[in-house]
């Protein structure tokens, strides 16, 4: 065996350190079926990420974001993770995924250790096979599968199963790790090995030597000879956890080896405040030891020695010893493929045990507060909601100096880290704050007839009337980048529409967002609804927020097209309002006015090229090529220092063309523009439908018939005639402000203001009406009469 280790490229080590060790290498994988090898090779979608690893041990990590610095990691695989649902045999797919993730982390320079169950299940499968082989032909023919199970299970003693399964389990791990050029070593321990000082030193030395040589130790209790569990005791004045199961073994091993992180995988999502499956059970994101009294434990899992209570006790003991702990689900098919690497990357998976008490409410608690506050907000009178918004507008001007001081801190910290356009978005000024205040007062004025407005009234039958009324959507999550002025705008729209609101701003605007949120809550407090608008801590990952489908009803991203695409991809069961791209077109018709074209092109492209409603593709009618109008357009673009990209057709007309466009479906967001030639208005429409993003498209022409044809046939959220693309904006549309621009085809489209944040519900008022009254022989008949809609007093 030592020679095999040497042939793997490692130096041999002292033999006296090997009382429990069985090294496994590439030379002993002949007993594994080729199908298993192929299955392992199919798992290859985890990226290799290089991170600085400065930790060896010390205090446990305070936050999830610090877990990426963990160097030494123990992964404990529970019986429910390793075994199949029938508890006989191993779950090969899950094991293949786990081995791949462990290998990826090992190859990043981390020191990985596995504590695994599964020997009993593997041995049970093998012994059942032996029982079947030992039967006579007559017994085999007359014994059904269920009869075999009933006969076999009582006679299979767990220790015998463990003895029969250890070698096969290790051979399986060996074959899997071999695919990633990693060696593994098996170590079997009992509780006595931790209580005997000499054995503890030998075990510690063996593990350190294996880690030094880049070998993954695979540790398990020696279930073939394990004695009954002993009570927890003191070891030289230190509280010591007894090795009663693999949970306590993993905790004991993690502390003995001064491990940075212990990952405990089981068949539940993590630690709940009450038994999973109960109506009010909620997953605990961060567990602080002082909160133990708030947790109620249920029964243990379907297999294994311990339940969640045993896991928590082991986790708290490890945490006390300086090891961070995460308990997570290793069986869920949607997350198990990356659960280990996701935990190490700091993603919100399972329950993170921390000795640092969370400074504020969790995002789940914030979601509940926003829900409750939003419902209270919706019950206020329209005048009260308008009063809150007016008060917020006053605070923006009254507290101007404090706001600008906070914004100055953000700008100073961002200097040299952000590009000039982003710094411009980040910057606040007196004029910006004054414009914000004006916009908020417009929202307040338009909010008088929003929530509770009757859209339809129908008399179903005598004394049975139906109404359709507007109501808030619920809880909105608005994610925005670099623009702190977005916060009061969106907050005012949420207040006017009676929605609860979660705000997630970029860390580059942390100081500005903090003071603007405080002012928003101050305005809300005048009517006792302070909690309706919540600012999410910057530590929360956007991807984690997008998974809160039970907390959030609508996500509205405000930022780059890449941000929108990422959120649309990450959102799990939550609708996203927005547009991933703003590829806006302008078609210059053969009947276009010379004076209008250059003004419209300049304003659409050069006024604010980073905006989502800026012009990106200019379509020119072919009859305009080599005309004074075309020359004026090109000269103006050169003066404005706009880089031109030639489309394929346009390039064919030129002897010396600008750089040919790489893609006709490009949002430049800068002083760059694609020019392409089209044959007629229909050709322009076809081009827009093929390469556009359904955002904003314009025709420039003096021919009214051509213009109307374009307006009616272009399928975009905004279609203009002789107007700049930059008019595609909520403020310019008279909406007061907008939460974003939507290119979706349901609910809201184009600039989305107050109306886009409302939905409807039906109110039916009757007097002891039942459906059977309207049957063929019933006493009532359907009337379905449209009734007049009462006008609300908005003064």
From Swiss-Prot:
GO terms for biological process: citrulline biosynthetic process; glutamate metabolic process; L-proline biosynthetic process; ornithine biosynthetic process; proline biosynthetic process; response to temperature stimulus. Keywords: Amino-acid biosynthesis, ATP-binding, Disease variant, Hereditary spastic paraplegia, Intellectual disability, Kinase, Mitochondrion, Multifunctional enzyme, NADP, Neurodegeneration, Nucleotide-binding, Oxidoreductase, Proline biosynthesis, Transferase. The modification N6-succinyllysine is found at residues 311, 347, 550. Changing residue 84 to Q: In ARCL3A; reduction of activity; loss of punctate pattern in mitochondria when overexpressed. It is found in: Mitochondrion; Mitochondrion matrix. GO terms for cellular component: mitochondrial inner membrane; mitochondrial matrix; mitochondrion. GO terms for molecular function: ATP binding; glutamate 5-kinase activity; glutamate-5-semialdehyde dehydrogenase activity; identical protein binding; RNA binding. Disulfide bonds: none annotated. Substrate binds at residues 117, 223, 246. Changing residue 299 to I: In ARCL3A; benign. Changing residue 247 to A: No effect on punctate pattern in the mitochondria. It catalyses: L-glutamate + ATP = L-glutamyl 5-phosphate + ADP; L-glutamate 5-semialdehyde + phosphate + NADP(+) = L-glutamyl 5-phosphate + NADPH + H(+). Pathway: Amino-acid biosynthesis; L-proline biosynthesis; L-glutamate 5-semialdehyde from L-glutamate: step 1/2; Amino-acid biosynthesis; L-proline biosynthesis; L-glutamate 5-semialdehyde from L-glutamate: step 2/2. InterPro entries: AceGlu_kinase-like_sf (IPR036393), Ald_DH/histidinol_DH (IPR016161), Ald_DH_C (IPR016163), Ald_DH_N (IPR016162), Aldehyde_DH_dom (IPR015590), Asp/Glu/Uridylate_kinase (IPR001048), G-glutamylP_reductase_CS (IPR020593), G5K_ProBA (IPR041744). Changing residue 612 to A: Catalytically inactive; no effect on filament formation; no effect on punctate pattern in the mitochondria. Changing residue 252 to Q: In SPG9A; altered homohexamerization; no effect on localization to the mitochondrion; loss of glutamate 5-kinase activity; no effect on glutamate-5-semialdehyde dehydrogenase activity; decreased amino acid biosynthetic process. Isoform Short: Inhibited by L-ornithine with a Ki of approximately 0.25 mm. Isoform Long: Insensitive to ornithine inhibition. This is due to the two amino acid insert which abolishes feedback inhibition of P5CS activity by L-ornithine. Gene3D superfamilies: Acetylglutamate kinase-like, Aldehyde Dehydrogenase, Chain A, domain 1, Aldehyde Dehydrogenase, Chain A, domain 2. ATP binds at residues 266-267, 305-311. It is linked to Cutis laxa, autosomal recessive, 3A: A syndrome characterized by facial dysmorphism with a progeroid appearance, large and late-closing fontanel, cutis laxa, joint hyperlaxity, athetoid movements and hyperreflexia, pre- and postnatal growth retardation, intellectual deficit, developmental delay, and ophthalmologic abnormalities. Can form homodimers/multimers. Bifunctional enzyme that converts glutamate to glutamate 5-semialdehyde, an intermediate in the biosynthesis of proline, ornithine and arginine. This is Delta-1-pyrroline-5-carboxylate synthase. The lineage of its organism: Eukaryota, Metazoa, Chordata, Craniata, Vertebrata. The gene is ALDH18A1.
């Amino acid at each position: 065996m030592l020679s095999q280790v040497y042939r793997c490229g490692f130096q041999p080590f002292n033999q006296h350190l090997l009382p429990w060790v069985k090294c496994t290498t590439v030379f002993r994988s002949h007993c594994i079926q080729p199908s298993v090898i192929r299955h392992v090779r199919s798992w290859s979608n985890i990226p290799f990420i290089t991170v600085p690893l400065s930790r060896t041990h010390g205090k446990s990590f305070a936050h999830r974001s610090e877990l990426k610095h963990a160097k030494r990691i123990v992964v404990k695989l529970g019986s429910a993770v390793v075994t199949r649902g029938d508890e006989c045999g191993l779950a090969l797919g899950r094991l293949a995924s786990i081995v791949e993730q462990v290998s990826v982390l090992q190859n990043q320079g981390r020191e990985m250790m596995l504590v695994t169950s599964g020997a009993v299940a593997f041995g049970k499968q093998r012994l059942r096979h032996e029982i079947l082989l030992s039967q006579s032909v007559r017994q085999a023919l007359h014994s059904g599968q269920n009869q075999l199970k009933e006969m076999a299970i009582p006679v299979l003693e767990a220790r015998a199963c463990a003895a029969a399964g250890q070698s096969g389990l290790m051979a399986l791990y060996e074959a899997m790790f071999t695919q990633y050029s990693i060696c593994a070593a098996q170590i079997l321990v009992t509780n006595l090995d931790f209580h005997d000082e000499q054995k503890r030193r030998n075990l510690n030395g063996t593990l350190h030597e294996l880690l030094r040589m880049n070998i993954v130790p695979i540790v398990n209790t020696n279930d073939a000879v394990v004695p009954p569990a002993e009570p927890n005791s003191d070891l030289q004045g230190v509280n010591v956890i007894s090795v009663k199961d693999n949970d306590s073994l993993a905790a004991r091993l993690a502390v003995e080896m001064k491990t940075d992180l212990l990952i405990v995988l089981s068949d539940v999502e993590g630690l709940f405040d009450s038994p999973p499956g109960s109506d009010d059970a909620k997953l605990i994101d961060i567990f602080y030891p002082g909160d133990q009294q708030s947790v109620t434990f249920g029964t243990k899992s379907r297999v294994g020695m311990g339940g969640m209570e045993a896991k928590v006790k082991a986790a708290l003991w490890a945490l006390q010893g300086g090891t961070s702990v995460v308990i997570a689900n290793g069986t869920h098919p949607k997350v198990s493929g990356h659960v280990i690497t996701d935990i190490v990357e700091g993603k919100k998976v399972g329950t993170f045990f921390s000795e640092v008490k969370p400074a504020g409410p969790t995002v789940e608690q914030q979601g509940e507060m926003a829900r409750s506050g939003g419902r209270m907000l919706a019950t206020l009178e329209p005048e009260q909601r308008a009063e809150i918004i007016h008060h917020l507008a006053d605070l923006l001007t009254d507290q101007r100096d404090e706001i600008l001081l906070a914004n100055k801190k953000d700008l100073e910290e961002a200097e040299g880290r952000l590009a000039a356009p982003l710094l411009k978005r980040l910057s606040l000024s007196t004029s910006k704050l004054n414009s914000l205040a004006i916009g908020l007062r417009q929202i307040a004025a338009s909010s008088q007839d929003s929530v509770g407005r009757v859209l339809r009234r129908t008399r179903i039958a005598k004394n049975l009337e139906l109404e359709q009324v507007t109501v808030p959507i619920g809880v909105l999550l608005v994610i925005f980048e670099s623009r702190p002025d977005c916060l009061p705008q969106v907050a005012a729209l949420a207040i006017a529409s009676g929605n609860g609101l979660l705000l997630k701003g970029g860390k580059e605007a942390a100081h500005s967002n903090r003071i603007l949120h405080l002012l928003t809550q101050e305005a809300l407090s005048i009517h006792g609804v302070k909690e309706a608008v919540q600012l999410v801590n910057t530590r929360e990952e956007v991807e984690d927020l997008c998974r809160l489908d039970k907390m959030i009803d609508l996500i509205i991203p405000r930022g780059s097209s890449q941000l929108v695409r990422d959120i649309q991809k990450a959102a799990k069961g939550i609708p996203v309002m927005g547009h991933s791209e703003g590829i806006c077109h302008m078609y210059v018709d053969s009947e276009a006015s010379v004076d209008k074209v250059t003004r419209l092109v300049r304003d659409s492209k050069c006024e604010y090229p980073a905006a989502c409603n800026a012009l990106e593709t200019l379509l020119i009618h072919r009859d305009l090529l080599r005309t004074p109008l075309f020359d004026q357009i090109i000269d103006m673009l050169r003066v404005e220092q706009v880089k031109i990209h030639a489309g394929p057709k346009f390039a064919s007309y030129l002897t010396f063309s600008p750089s040919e466009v790489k893609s006709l479906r490009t949002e430049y967001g800068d002083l760059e523009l694609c020019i392409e030639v089209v044959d007629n208005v229909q050709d322009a429409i076809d081009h827009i439908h093929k390469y556009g993003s359904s955002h904003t498209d314009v025709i420039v022409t003096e021919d009214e018939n051509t213009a109307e044809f374009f307006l009616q046939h272009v399928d975009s959220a905004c279609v203009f005639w002789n107007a700049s693309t930059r008019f595609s904006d909520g403020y310019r549309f008279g909406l007061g402000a907008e939460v974003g621009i939507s290119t979706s085809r349901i609910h809201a489209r184009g600039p989305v203001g107050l109306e886009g944040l409302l939905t409807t519900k039906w109110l039916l008022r009757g007097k002891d009406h039942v459906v059977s009254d309207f049957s063929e022989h019933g006493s009532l008949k359907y009337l379905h009469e449209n009734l007049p809609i009462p006008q609300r007093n908005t003064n």
